[in-house]
A protein has these predicted regions:
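Acidic/His-rich, metal-assisted hydrolase cores and their charged scaffolds
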Residues: 1-207
């Protein structure tokens, strides 16, 4: 068994993705006068589904921005892995047709990548989205080790434009913690165990 080691130093179980859904509901409820821009990993299809579900509940149109985000959601739709209610998804070119408080933008750039959509919005070079005081930006991810400075730079640029930035309690890890790792070993009972994925100290912690 090759088992993920990324969270091998963290005690307990990894929290359920459902907890993020409750957080989204609270944020949408408390920011009904703002445009919401949510940055997350494009590969986290379940997270994107939760955002879309909450947007639909609150009567907001959803715009997907960022090449990888668009490509993955298109693929997920074709495979039946994501369900988008009719008339919820709109093209970014139609964003101006709706008031700010009726829209949500799901975007790439949660790790502060220079050319990602959110970074271009923050640095005022995005062609379709301009950030202002009526925007609430939600980072639904944690910085990958080494990306902290890049993420902080983007947050600073967003806040300098008057936007509110939320980056706490809007993410749960996709990696197994100690009790999850113990559980999978007890269920599989492998002949050989190979810790993978993580820094050396993470591999040692699992071993």
């Amino acid at each position: 068994l090759m088992c993920d080691s990324t969270n091998a130093e963290r005690k307990g179980f990894t929290q359920s993705e459902r907890t993020v859904g409750h957080t989204f509901d609270t944020i949408f409820h408390e920011h009904q006068g703002s445009r919401l821009i949510i940055a997350t990993f494009a590969s986290n299809v379940d997270r994107v589904q939760q955002i879309i579900n909450t947007a639909h509940k609150y009567g907001r149109k959803v715009v997907v921005e960022g090449r990888s985000m668009v490509n993955i959601i298109d693929t997920a739709m074709n495979l039946g892995c994501i369900n988008i209610p009719e008339n919820t998804l709109v093209d970014i070119d139609r964003l101006k047709d709706y008031p700010d408080d009726r829209t949500v933008i799901i975007t790439t750039g949660s790790q502060g990548e220079n050319m990602a959509a959110l970074s271009r919005m923050a640095s005022s070079v995005h062609r379709k989205v301009s950030i202002g005081p009526n925007d609430t930006i939600i980072f639904s991810s944690n910085p990958i080790p080494g990306n902290e400075k890049a993420v902080t730079r983007v947050i600073n640029e967003l806040e300098m434009k008057g936007a509110e930035v939320i980056f706490q309690d809007v993410h749960v890890s996709g990696h197994a913690c100690q009790e999850d790792i113990k559980l999978i070993y007890s269920l599989v009972n492998p002949k050989y165990a190979i810790p993978v994925h993580g820094e050396y100290k993470h591999l040692v912690a699992q071993a």
